[in-house]
A protein has these predicted regions:
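Charged, terminal alpha-helix-loop-beta segments
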Residues: 1-333
Length: 333
């Protein structure tokens, strides 16, 4: 039986209290349990956070809460993704220490390892099929997909059964489509699914799951087609620093290219307020091109002051670029 949410938050708070007592020797002024962990304001201008769920996304929330508490030293305890957290911690001017928790024992997290991208399979004929079908071909961490306005409608699969294109929006949809339309020619199948997605991913479309999924990738697709909107001369889709695990999770979308003056740029797009956007964006630049200018592109309504506060905590701050809230209505004309 799943724990009651309130009981889960209480247990998270108790665990953080225990870790602080055992490893930091600070008095706790306030502790709050959350769905994903816990946050604690400590004596001596210090702050502690516990990451129990979605650990790789814990850095932004910890730093934002530390800023509100005027803390100048942050400790993050996590049981998973401590390499990601430690790597991102080094990109901030704030003093951040990451602890790896195993069986109630905390140790200093290992030095962050550089991210390496898995090579994509060499399947030029299948890639050409996606391109000839009018899809945007995107490769991330060895996975090749075909997208329509930023939403995946086809994926190249290479396994023991051979190399092939599976059609559908996400893994479950691909399986269902194969069961119902397994004998349909690939090009025809792509066209059928792509047309449905195009119909729903237009400004005038009624609310629908197909126009709510992957909004950040929809925004990126606009910028790839119209880089001048943010002062760039060329942009191409680029992989995130951590591979996406599913289509439903909102993960900032990344692009790389050149500004009008020729300067290399890494662009990170997001829709909605995301406290972990700045750590993610800084990690994306580190992964793709540490010397590039970093631009964080968000709708104006999502340009919350905490985003700027976190951006200013980076050793090499990004350009935060708010764009029109009606970006879905942009056209290429």
């Amino acid at each position: 039986m799943a724990l009651d949410p309130e009981r889960r938050r209480q247990l998270h708070a108790m665990k953080l209290k225990s870790l602080v007592r055992d490893y930091l020797d600070d008095s706790i002024e306030e502790v709050v349990g959350t769905d994903d962990g816990a946050l604690a304001t400590l004596s001596g201008a210090r702050f502690a956070a516990l990451a129990e769920e979605r650990c790789e996304r814990a850095m932004g929330g910890a730093l934002a809460s530390a800023l509100r508490s005027a803390a100048d030293e942050v400790h993050v305890f996590a049981s998973d993704s401590t390499d990601v957290l430690a790597r991102r911690a080094e990109l901030f001017s704030t003093s951040v220490k990451v602890w790896e928790v195993n069986g109630g024992v905390a140790t200093s997290a290992d030095s962050p390892k550089p991210v390496t991208e898995k090579p994509a399979p060499d399947v030029p004929e299948l890639v050409s099929t996606l391109q000839d079908s009018g899809l945007e071909v995107v490769t991330e961490h060895g996975v090749i997909v075909g997208e329509v306005v930023g939403l995946e409608v086809a994926r190249i699969i290479c396994d023991a059964q051979g190399d092939r294109i599976e059609v559908g929006v996400g893994a479950h949809d691909r399986e269902a489509f194969a069961l119902l339309h397994g004998n349909m020619p690939t090009v025809e199948a792509i066209e059928q699914v792509a047309n449905v997605v195009r119909f729903h991913r237009t400004p005038a479309a009624e609310p629908h799951p197909l126009n709510r999924l992957g909004a950040e990738r929809w925004l990126r697709s606009h910028l790839l087609a119209q880089p001048a909107r943010i002062g760039a001369s060329e942009l191409k889709a680029a992989p995130p620093p951590v591979q996406r695990t599913n289509l439903k999770e909102a993960v900032p979308a990344v692009a790389a290219g050149h500004l009008d003056d020729g300067v290399d740029v890494v662009v990170v797009c997001a829709v909605g307020i995301d406290l972990d956007l700045i750590p993610f964006a800084a990690d994306a630049r580190l992964f793709l091109d540490p010397q590039a200018t970093l631009m964080v592109v968000i709708p104006q309504r999502d340009a919350h002051s905490v985003l700027y506060d976190l951006a200013n905590q980076l050793i090499d701050p990004p350009l935060v670029v708010p764009i029109d809230d009606a970006w879905r209505e942009w056209t290429t004309s």
